[in-house]
């Protein structure tokens, strides 16, 4: 029986291509059944898209939890139903463009844990349906504000009415919403004109595979090990006997973990392959949470 390909691909998504298009191309090129991305990028956006293949699809949520880094460009004086330049854009009349210092101060007010309303054209679920589907159907609905975390925002360029920022944020943050909210603060509106995701955690655009490279016959050689998806977790190295027990879902006591302050750990076998992600209980008992076969080739 042919061994299932397993691992991660870090891809530089081009503009005009959907995240699903990227997954479809990977799936076709590698001839795999299980394949999924770890965080949607809109067609307008470019940059880092992590695609999980094979058993690594079980780790999608861990990649989604990683910090995101973006570079976004915006234009004052416009509003849009999508909060970006690709929607139904309207010009705002009779407004004054803010000074750079005021824009910087306003951006700084977004740093921290804030309440943010997602765009109506987004993948947020509303009564079991995607918000963008309801918006396209012309349905009336309201989205509730959600708490998101913005760790850093820097105004890189300000050539009124255009401006560009660098942003470091947590999962669930909508960059379009930040631009919209800033435009509302100044009473002049703002839409996003370009967006690039420069990194997710340690996955950086400089290391990413291009759209064209996804057609190369040696694409499987570019798979990164599954353990990279949990690189932010503490690591526990175990011997072969222990790894076999964990692979079968057995709970094992590790006395040295009793006084640890973390709840989850990435468990590696002697060859540094990811065996599982395990939950640590207060007693030092380690309970496998997500198991990946220790003999999987590309883990």
Where are the regions that the model predicts?
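Accessory RNA 3′-end/elbow-binding domains used by RNA modification enzymes
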Residues: 1-14, 20-37, 41, 45, ...
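Catalytic cores of RNA-modifying enzymes
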Residues: 1-171, 175-209
């Amino acid at each position: 029986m042919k061994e299932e390909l397993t691992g991660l691909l870090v891809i530089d998504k081009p503009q005009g291509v959907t995240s699903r298009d990227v997954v479809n191309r990977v799936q076709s090129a590698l001839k795999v059944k299980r394949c999924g991305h770890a965080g949607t990028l809109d067609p307008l956006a470019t940059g880092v898209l992590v695609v999980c293949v094979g058993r690594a699809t079980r780790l999608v949520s861990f990649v989604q939890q990683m910090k995101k880094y973006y570079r976004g460009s915006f234009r004052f004086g416009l509003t849009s139903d999508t909060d970006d330049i690709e929607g139904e854009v309207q010009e705002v009349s009779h407004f004054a463009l803010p000074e750079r210092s005021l824009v910087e101060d306003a951006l700084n007010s977004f740093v921290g844990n804030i309440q943010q309303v997602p765009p109506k054209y987004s993948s947020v679920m509303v009564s079991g349906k995607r918000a963008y589907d309801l918006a396209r159907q012309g349905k009336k609905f309201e989205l509730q504000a959600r708490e998101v975390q913005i760790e850093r925002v820097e105004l890189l360029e300000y050539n009124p009415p255009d401006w560009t920022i660098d942003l470091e944020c947590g999962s669930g943050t909508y960059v379009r919403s930040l631009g919209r909210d800033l435009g509302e603060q100044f009473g002049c509106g703002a839409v996003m004109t370009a967006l690039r995701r420069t990194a997710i955690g340690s996955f950086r655009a400089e290391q990413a595979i291009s759209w064209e490279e996804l057609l190369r016959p040696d694409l499987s050689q570019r798979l990164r090990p599954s353990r990279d998806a949990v690189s932010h977790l503490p690591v526990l190295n175990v011997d072969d006997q222990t790894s076999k027990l964990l692979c079968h879902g057995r709970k094992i006591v590790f006395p040295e973990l009793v006084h640890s302050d973390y709840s989850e750990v990435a468990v590696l076998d002697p060859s540094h392959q990811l065996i599982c992600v395990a939950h640590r209980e207060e007693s030092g008992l380690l309970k496998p949470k997500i198991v990946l076969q220790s003999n999987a080739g590309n883990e």
